[in-house]
Swiss-Prot record:
<dbReference type="GO" id="GO:0006098">
    <property type="term" value="P:pentose-phosphate shunt"/>
</dbReference>
<dbReference type="InterPro" id="IPR013785">
    <property type="entry name" value="Aldolase_TIM"/>
</dbReference>
<feature type="active site" description="Schiff-base intermediate with substrate">
    <location>
        <position position="83"/>
    </location>
</feature>
<dbReference type="InterPro" id="IPR004731">
    <property type="entry name" value="Transaldolase_3B/F6P_aldolase"/>
</dbReference>
<dbReference type="InterPro" id="IPR018225">
    <property type="entry name" value="Transaldolase_AS"/>
</dbReference>
<protein>
    <recommendedName>
        <fullName>Probable transaldolase</fullName>
        <ecNumber>2.2.1.2</ecNumber>
    </recommendedName>
</protein>
<dbReference type="InterPro" id="IPR033919">
    <property type="entry name" value="TSA/FSA_arc/bac"/>
</dbReference>
<dbReference type="Pfam" id="PF00923">
    <property type="entry name" value="TAL_FSA"/>
</dbReference>
<dbReference type="GO" id="GO:0004801">
    <property type="term" value="F:transaldolase activity"/>
</dbReference>
<comment type="pathway">
    <text>Carbohydrate degradation; pentose phosphate pathway; D-glyceraldehyde 3-phosphate and beta-D-fructose 6-phosphate from D-ribose 5-phosphate and D-xylulose 5-phosphate (non-oxidative stage): step 2/3.</text>
</comment>
<dbReference type="GO" id="GO:0005975">
    <property type="term" value="P:carbohydrate metabolic process"/>
</dbReference>
<keyword id="KW-0570">Pentose shunt</keyword>
<comment type="similarity">
    <text>Belongs to the transaldolase family. Type 3B subfamily.</text>
</comment>
<comment type="function">
    <text>Transaldolase is important for the balance of metabolites in the pentose-phosphate pathway.</text>
</comment>
<keyword id="KW-0808">Transferase</keyword>
<dbReference type="GO" id="GO:0005737">
    <property type="term" value="C:cytoplasm"/>
</dbReference>
<dbReference type="GO" id="GO:0016832">
    <property type="term" value="F:aldehyde-lyase activity"/>
</dbReference>
Amino acid sequence: MKFFIDTAEIEEIRQANLRGWVDGVTTNPSLIAKSGKDFHTVIKEICKEITGPVSAEVISLQHEEMVREGKELAKLASNVVVKIPMCEDGMIAVKKLKSEGIKTNVTLVFSPMQALLAAKAGATMVSPFVGRLDDIGVEGMQMVDQVIQMYRNYDFETEVLVASVRSPMHIQLAAEMGADIATIPFKVMQSMTHHPLTDKGIKMFMDDWNKAQKK
């Protein structure tokens, strides 16, 4: 299973990469806006930090403009994946970009049918948003399981990238289901290293060691 980090912060990417946790990066306009930097500058900086896929999102909702923006983004670095919102124009853009050898990540997917359409259009990756579904009382991970099963039934090459991750349990379930990728905020990655018994055990070992040194 591949881990992507969901951030536009260079230092978070560096720290996660230092720990061996990062296979790629996902960004969106909101994350980049928080950085206060130029959009293309941020994407270039990220692509210098990591060799894996870096998802960069188009802003337009018209397919001609999506394709134009996608081509511009793809020129920034060889590992850029163009992020396209799930909509009819988006599917036209995905098909066109695929025909030109440009990889795509269809985002804002909230149903198995949307994921199926994205795969039919030729998306490289599809991003089901689990946390936002959970927020409205729908079990997000159940949708992921359905998407994975459908893709396996028909041997789609589109990778399932679990997004809108809120907790380590989302990652565990994604791994159990066989999702290809999960994109994870750095804080959630850090929380995955902890367990009350691990923390307690480390403290006990250190206390015992310090006592022994005083004898």
